[in-house]
Amino acid sequence: MISVALIILFLAKVISGKSDDFISVNPETNMLIDGYGRERFFHGTNVVVKHFPFHPETTGFNKDTFSEDDMKILQKFGLNSIRLGMMLPGYVPKREEYNETYIKVIQSIVTTAAKYGIYTLLDMHQDVFSPKFCVEGMPDWIVNTQGAKDFPMPLHKPFNLDPKTGYPYPEDCAKFSWADYYFTEAAGQAFQNLYDNVDGLRDEWAQFWKKTADVFKEEPSVIGYELINEPFCGNVFKHPTLLIPGVADYLNLQPTYDALQKAIRQVDEEHNIFFEGVTWDFFEVGFTEVPGGKQYQNRSVLSYHYYEPPDFSKKLNFEARLLDLKRLKCGGFLTEMFTVGTDFNSMFEMFDLCDKFKQSWHGWMYKSYGCIEQNLGCLNMSSPGKESIQIANTSRTYPQAVAGRTQSYAFDIKTKVFTLVYETVGSCKSGRTIVYFNKNLHYPNGYRYEINPNFKVTPSENEYFLYLDEVNKVPNTVVTFKLFPLSFTDSEDIHPVTVMGDKHLSENHNENEKKKK
């Protein structure tokens, strides 16, 4: 007989929307799911520190922090996920020497973020491999350019090196855009030697991921491990066909990812592995299967990015990625797109398409964290107070957990109307759907909702969420939920009222009436 204590514990998890189970993938629907079988959606931001100490400050609040103050801001604006830089030079500054202090800081960020309902994707970030190539990513010991001309040939004659660092001088690096340095022999050869396991370098990379996974293997708030950010194709001077979309994915990345996956699975069979193709896979990616093969489809997520340029069509990009997901039978996640700057129309268009194609996303980026080339962070430190964070622009009404099969959802940034349609399924162990909404930002005069059929709708105590609970658990029921803002006129004239019919529930929540009481 099940004990009363166990029943209470289970109900507490359902009510809070939390679970001790890991996020996984339904290979047939390509959706991320939790332990209750609910489809899960994530909106978030990147937290990546590309220079020493390779992690953010964890106390206080300033341009270099990711502390509990920052986490509270993300929670308020409905950002339930971060893509956190899990940096190879931070954890393994010297070959076979692991910095345990670094991993403890990363671990503390993960566990503290979980207290605020924030999940973490651990991202081994790099851009053009190394500071030796004017950018960042890998520690010096893993940079092997054997067989290549001196950097940055053929882009330019060899740069002089700073004798203190061994790196090119910043004024020389500034002569070209950082992305141009991918097309140097030295950078391409460094990638190629890593993929080919020259001097056992790929084995060392695999060991990095094995040790990382061993630390986080029991942490359910970790969505997964992203093996490498924006991998380059390899040495295109010796193998120019690698520039053909899909070729490098199959020839270089797929066997490399299999090797990394094998190392991770020695200690962690539960977490998702996020894998990414080259950045110019405008159409189909070149992978023939997920890392590790078909048996890992339910723990594999294709990571992809969108920037214009080099990308050229938002809609075509999503359509191509959905075809990849169906073919590979894995999940998908847009792990980078611009959520900074002033082109809000383009950003809102991306958000609308993410809703349409039911894709989770991470914006680039939360703060600049001192990175000169990426000094486009969301934090405006010239304005007083934490509310100057422009990340409010990313706050949208959306479902964080859906107790069934999501058919569609959409948020209109102009009217603030939100619509969710889903079908209940018998295999779902929870009847609770969770909708995030920013009451102060989008519904300052109050809100009303309509739901069909007659489900119970309850706001959370902190009024960040609306809970949609099945009254009678009936599979294959199509549920339609709509949320509307009250206008100023409405808020003066309409009193809170609940109207119930056979299949329809409508309720107004009036801020002015609440204040009068």
Swiss-Prot record:
Keywords assigned: Carbohydrate metabolism, Cellulose degradation, Glycoprotein, Glycosidase, Hydrolase, Polysaccharide degradation, Secreted, Signal
One Gene Ontology cellular component annotation held by this UniProt entry: extracellular region
One of the GO biological process terms: glycosphingolipid catabolic process
Tissue expression profile of the protein: Expressed uniformly in digestive cells, tentacles and peduncle regions suggesting expression in the endoderm throughout the whole body (at protein level).
Glycosylated residue positions: N99, N298, N380, N393
A GO molecular-function descriptor: endoglycosylceramidase activity
Reaction(s) this enzyme catalyzes, per UniProt: an oligoglycosyl-(1->4)-beta-D-glucosyl-(1<->1)-ceramide + H2O = an oligoglycosyl-(1->4)-D-glucose + an N-acyl-sphingoid base
pH dependence of function: Optimum pH is 3.0-4.0. Highly stable at acidic pH.
Localisation per UniProt entry: Secreted
Gene3D superfamilies for the chain: Glycosidases (3.20.20.80), Golgi alpha-mannosidase II (2.60.40.1180)
Entry EC no(s): 3.2.1.123
Active site (catalytic residues): E230 (proton donor)
Signal peptide residue numbers: 1-17
InterPro entries: GH5_C (IPR041036), Glyco_hydro_5 (IPR001547), Glyco_hydro_5_CS (IPR018087), Glyco_hydro_b (IPR013780), Glycoside_hydrolase_SF (IPR017853), Glycosphingolipid_Hydrolases (IPR052066)
Record entry for activity regulation: Cu(2+), zinc, manganese, calcium, magnesium and EDTA have no significant effects on enzyme activity. Enzyme requires presence of detergents such as Triton X-100 and Lubrol PX for the hydrolysis of glycosphingolipids. Taurodeoxycholate strongly inhibits the enzyme activity.
Family designation: Belongs to the glycosyl hydrolase 5 (cellulase A) family.
Biological role: Hydrolysis of the glycosidic linkage between oligosaccharides and ceramides of glycosphingolipids, optimal substrates appear to be the glycosphingolipids with a gangliotetraose structure.
PANTHER family: ENDOGLYCOCERAMIDASE, PTHR31308
Name recorded for this polypeptide: Endoglycoceramidase
